[in-house]
Amino acid sequence: MKRRVLGRTGEQLSIIGFGGILVMDESAKESERLVNKAIEKGINYFDVAPNYGNAQQMLGPALKPYRDDVFLACKSELRDYDGVMSDFTESLKLLKTDHIDLYQLHAVTTDEDVNRILSKDGALNAFQELRDKGVIRYIGFSAHTEEAALRLLDHFDFDTILFPFNWVTWHKNDFGKKLMKLAQERNLGILALKALAKRALAKGEEKAYPKAWYYPVDTFDEAQKALKFTLSLPITAAVTPGHEKFFNWACEIAEDDQLLTEQELEWLKKDAKALKPIFPED
């Protein structure tokens, strides 16, 4: 699988990332099968978080034989120093490793999140201390609002961002365009979430897939256009949704390595007009 450079870090990552939620609630045997499949396909970027149920517990043993050859990203959604330190210790234990390559503030959304993270006893001080100790290599964040992401970048020199760069949000709301521009100017590593999300669920609508809180693409053809769009942006990699069908589609599309055509781009722009984007949230 093709690899791209993760901004100024110089790390070479596969253009498809393995979303740890894939192994959430799976058996040890199934988790091992999924990780082995990813490795066979050339994936070296794995992303997980404590709030993905038991994903860390299932990913750790399955990934252990390959740990020295992969780039492991983890997160903490806690905003205080002590909480992050506790989260990190538990993540190391569950993931069967002695270090995390990329540790990220998870789902930063509100001004309050940012204020708590940046406070004297906030999460960011813990992240810096962990990096100084050598148990994490890079510091990043994922965000669900552009405002929160831009505020974080105003206050700290992060290595990476993880953000929903998606065809519907991009074309309907210009969501992420300011952030993308700033990240490029600073040569940050740019990672994408939700490339295969199609629309927000309607009120009372049941999930089509248990591990997806949004409605994903319907067909392989739609997935192909959507993922090719995200990969046409100056990103390093796109993390897959939590269901194997979409993981398989993403790998096939990446292996095919076809550029987005003008006709496909126009189709995506037109399709986006009729859809309710997943971000910004109401």
Sequence positions of predicted segments:
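A short, structured active-site edge motif that brings together acidic residues
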Residues: 69-80, 102-106
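Beta/alpha (TIM)-barrel catalytic core signal, keyed to glycine-rich beta->alpha loops juxtaposed to Asp/Glu
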Residues: 108-282
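N-terminal binding-site loop/beta-alpha segment at the start of enzyme catalytic domains
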Residues: 1-70
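Active-site mouth loops of central-metabolism enzymes
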Residues: 16-29, 73-83, 115-116, 210-218
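Conserved, mostly hydrophobic/aromatic
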Residues: 6, 18, 46, 59, ...
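Short, acidic/polar
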Residues: 25-38, 81-96, 144-153, 221-227
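Active-site groove signature of glycoside hydrolases
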Residues: 92-115
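Acidic (Asp/Glu)-rich catalytic clusters
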Residues: 7-10, 40, 59-68, 89-98, ...
